[in-house]
Amino acid sequence: MAIKDLDLKLQPDSVSISNINFDQLNSHVVIAEDGVMNVASLVKSDEAEVAEPEVQESQKAETKPFPISIDTVSINDGAVTFIDNTMSPRFTTKLSHFKGAIKGLSSAELARADVDLNGRVDDVAQLSVTGKINPLKGDLYSDIKIRFEGYDMTAVTPYTGNFIGQAVDKGQLDLDLGYRVSERELIGENEISLDQFTLGRDIKSEDAVDLPVGLAIALLKDANGRIDLSLPVRGNLDEPEFKISKIVFKALFNVITGIVTSPFKLLSNLAGGDQELDKVAFVPGELNMVSGHQTRLESLAKALTQRPQLRIEVRGMFDQDRDVQALQQQKLATFFELSEQVTFADLKLSSIEAKLNKQLGKEALTSIKAENMVLPEGANEKAKPELDVEAYRFALYESLLKAQPVTDDELRELARSRASQIRNYLVETEGLSPERVFIMEAEADDSANEAGVLTVFQLSVD
């Protein structure tokens, strides 16, 4: 280290330095197994050895900050080795070829020093630090941008193994970090880009988060194998448990949690809309989707094209009330050979009676007729009852409708046909690979969804 042009003055007090130069500075930052950093230990030791003399309150009030100014702090070919022994295996990385300058350091009010530093991490990744700082004032200020390019992600396996229970098989990391501290408030923007990030072997870890990380990666990774994430962070430096790493990890955890708990919301955003892409509704008893739901499939296919590692699982469903009623109506229409031109109201009453007699028997017909015999309006009790023809016709219709059998097999076949129709559309019309679309076992739809009978989607990872 070399100091150039040091000027110390007393009464009034001041220190000014033209240049402090660090040439080939080599240091180690080590985190012990108990989490204590070697730098922090040194600071605590120094503080313990220095006993502050007793000072009267009046003297404290008169004490003023010692004015300091340093024109330039230059660094040439520096190196820092970082070792984290809290991980198993331990994590080691080295910052080398570190050079640059900090210009304009001063304890003056509103002073801002310019920072321009750069180096290489593990001899490959490029690191640059630029911005403005003011570390010599009690009111800490910084506005720093950190650019990190081409870092080999396999090196962070000790961390991924600990936190997610898997090694990194391959991948490169780019970071654009922006951190601003003013009035003890931290505002940070983290732009993270991962290229070809792939997890590998499993690693046993009691601290691993219980999240479907593989699904999260597949949801985030685009068709070119890149993942881009924005992580804004906020914090106050005076908070007792403030740690920037803790804040960033919490933000990352929240992002991943939000993605895996609402994956179709992310797909909807990719498709440029706000539709519910996790389901479509069908007209009861039919293979026709309700109005507007076809566009959901178009948007879903568009999003899945951008996320090639995802598979879509299609589960057709049936409604034991609405589908049954609709199928019974269809069977009754076939039974009477009804059409748009010939409705049930057009049928002769005798024809309806004959059909009911054939299907339900004479006793049922007699019973229905008896139930619809009423006294003429205004007649006394001794008058002869007459047949209420309209009520009788409706009762015949209802009885015949309920008599049309709809089996569980028919309902499940309807649900499977709905799922097959969706699969065919996604594959044949939208061009998704057949290996990415799976039909699941049919289930009953108990949602009573107003739109219609649902077919629902789930996501899995290739």
List the predicted regions and their residue ranges.
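A short linear-motif detector with a strong N-terminal bias
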Residues: 1, 7-8, 53-54, 60-61, ...
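Secondary-structure transition motifs
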Residues: 1-97, 196-214, 237-254
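Beta-strand-dominated lipid-handling architectures at cellular/organellar boundaries
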Residues: 2-9, 14-16, 36-43, 81-161, ...
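Extended terminal
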Residues: 8-13, 18, 66-68, 134-147, ...
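Hydrophobic beta-strand residues in large extracellular and virion-surface proteins
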Residues: 73, 115-117, 312
